[in-house]
């Protein structure tokens, strides 16, 4: 028979257990909540929607936004408003592109659909992930963008999506979300659990494209870490963020960084070494009822460098985000569906 325990010892053990069970989440740090319902709206030009991705140039000017008619627009302040910065070769040639109406999903491939955007600050070049036309680039003066690549390893791009630039090397990391389904069939990627996506690298020196990782489930947004040692990739399905190690003992490894509370779109570095992840939709609980439905609508989360959630963004029901870009302490909000760009000062 074992030693008889003192009642005081039992009481202490119960207190410790209670603290572990009920106070555990607090130990990880309080998650800050930012409500975006009071954000300032910058309306897009009439007939234009879907500022899917946002970028700022090396001077901090912008944002620049890829929109529904195939153009990249630049915000010049409240006096200037939005002006055309870049477009594909077809934009000036096809009347549909300049008709002033939102192209349908069936016809947007003719005009192009810019998604991921990022500048290389040293050269001033803007790199564009066009869903249909491929990886593109335009110089600091804007104008007609040139196509840099339309495929890799003999496989054509089918749905070019997220993009980021290593500012030290000029190399571009981007995703081809599916080699089976184009953008207008993006729901089929999820419904059929398609896992034919790829993470790719455009070498700025050799001007070649390499496949870093294949057979991925809906890879979307991309962000190079602040130290350039890894690339974070948001997977719309299965609502996760992974990281690919570029150098060191773990070079080439692909590992889970975070499980996410919704379906992610773009991922961006924040100003503290972490990441902002835009959520196009929250996860749906199969057992959800009106009584158990969440009282807040998540549209984005902030992760630290280790993948721990430290902040969440909320919005009114029905609002979805595709991008959260931080610039000089302000949050700029892009959406693939809305008719404006949001600003949280």
Residue spans of the language-model regions?
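Sequence-structural signature of mature extracellular/luminal beta-sheet repeat domains
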Residues: 2-345
């Amino acid at each position: 028979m074992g030693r008889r325990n003192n009642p005081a010892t039992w009481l202490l053990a119960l207190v410790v257990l209670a603290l572990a069970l009920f106070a555990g989440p607090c130990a990880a740090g309080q998650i800050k909540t930012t409500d975006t319902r009071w954000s300032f709206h910058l309306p897009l030009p009439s007939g234009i929607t879907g500022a899917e991705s946002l970028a700022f140039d090396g001077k901090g000017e912008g944002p620049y936004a890829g929109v529904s008619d195939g153009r990249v627009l630049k915000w010049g302040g409240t006096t200037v408003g939005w002006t055309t910065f870049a477009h594909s070769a077809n934009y000036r040639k096809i009347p549909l592109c300049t008709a002033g109406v939102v192209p349908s999903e069936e016809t947007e491939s003719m005009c192009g659909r810019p998604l991921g955007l990022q500048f290389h600050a040293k050269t001033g070049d803007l790199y564009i992930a066009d869903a249909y036309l491929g990886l593109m680039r335009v110089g600091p003066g804007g104008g007609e963008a040139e196509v840099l690549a339309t495929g890799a390893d003999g496989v054509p791009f089918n749905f070019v999506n997220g993009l980021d630039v290593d500012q030290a090397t000029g190399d571009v990391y981007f995703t081809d979300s599916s080699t089976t389904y184009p953008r207008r069939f993006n729901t089929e990627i999820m419904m059929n659990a398609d896992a034919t996506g790829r993470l790719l690298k455009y070498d700025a020196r050799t001007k070649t494209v390499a496949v870093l990782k294949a057979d991925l489930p809906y890879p979307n947004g991309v962000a190079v870490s602040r130290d350039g040692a890894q690339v974070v990739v948001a997977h719309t399905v299965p609502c996760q963020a992974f990281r690919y190690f570029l150098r060191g003992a773990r070079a080439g490894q692909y590992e889970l960084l975070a499980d996410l509370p919704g379906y992610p779109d773009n991922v961006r570095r924040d100003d503290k070494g972490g990441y902002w992840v835009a959520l196009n939709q929250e996860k749906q609980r199969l057992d959800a009822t009106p009584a158990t439905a969440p009282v807040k609508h998540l549209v984005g989360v902030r992760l630290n460098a280790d993948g721990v959630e430290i902040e969440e963004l909320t919005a009114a029901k029905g609002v979805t985000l595709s991008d959260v870009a931080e610039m000089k302490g302000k949050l700029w909000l892009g959406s693939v569906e809305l008719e404006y760009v949001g600003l949280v000062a």
